UniProtKB/Swiss-Prot annotation:
PROSITE patterns xrefs: GLOBIN
Quaternary organization: Heterotetramer of two alpha chains and two epsilon chains in early embryonic hemoglobin Gower-2; two zeta chains and two epsilon chains in early embryonic hemoglobin Gower-1.
The organism's taxonomic lineage, starting at the top: Eukaryota, Metazoa, Chordata, Craniata, Vertebrata
Annotated CDD domains: Hb-beta-like
Keywords noted in UniProt: Heme, Iron, Metal-binding, Oxygen transport, Phosphoprotein, Transport
Name this polypeptide is given: Hemoglobin subunit epsilon
GO molecular-function term, one example from the UniProt record: haptoglobin binding
List of residues that carry Phosphoserine: 14, 51
Residues annotated to bind heme b: 64, 93
Keyword check for Metal-binding: yes
Gene: HBE1
Gene Ontology cellular-component annotations: blood microparticle; haptoglobin-hemoglobin complex; hemoglobin complex
Amino acid sequence: MVHFTAEEKAIIMSLWGKVNIEEAGGEALGRLLVVYPWTQRFFETFGNLSSASAIMGNPKVKAHGKKVLTSFGEAVKNMDNLKGAFAKLSELHCDKLHVDPENFKLLGNVMVIILATHFGKEFTPDVQAAWQKLVSGVATALAHKYH
């Protein structure tokens, strides 16, 4: 279980309140699909994923990215119980979707990159450390149901 200090929680919550969920979510999922093309196999119904520009402009990628980042908001609200907050999503991704849990780590790292690009100098090393801890905790929580 990940333990967050009061300062880390404040840092995460402060930045989260400024995140444009739709924009950052689409960018994060799009970047994941471009940088790690093998992840595209989980999104075969999304249509054209043939190039970086096709992926980044794909409305289904943007919509699902928003959904992913919206659910990530549950992590921000439940930092003290990430495992519980993501139990159902862990089960879905393990039992039904068969997503390799390593992909959760990749998406988390991409998310940190997106936040850094969006917030620039405001994304200090302390902010990055807190967010890296959160995305790592979420990846672990999502991987919980895997055997």
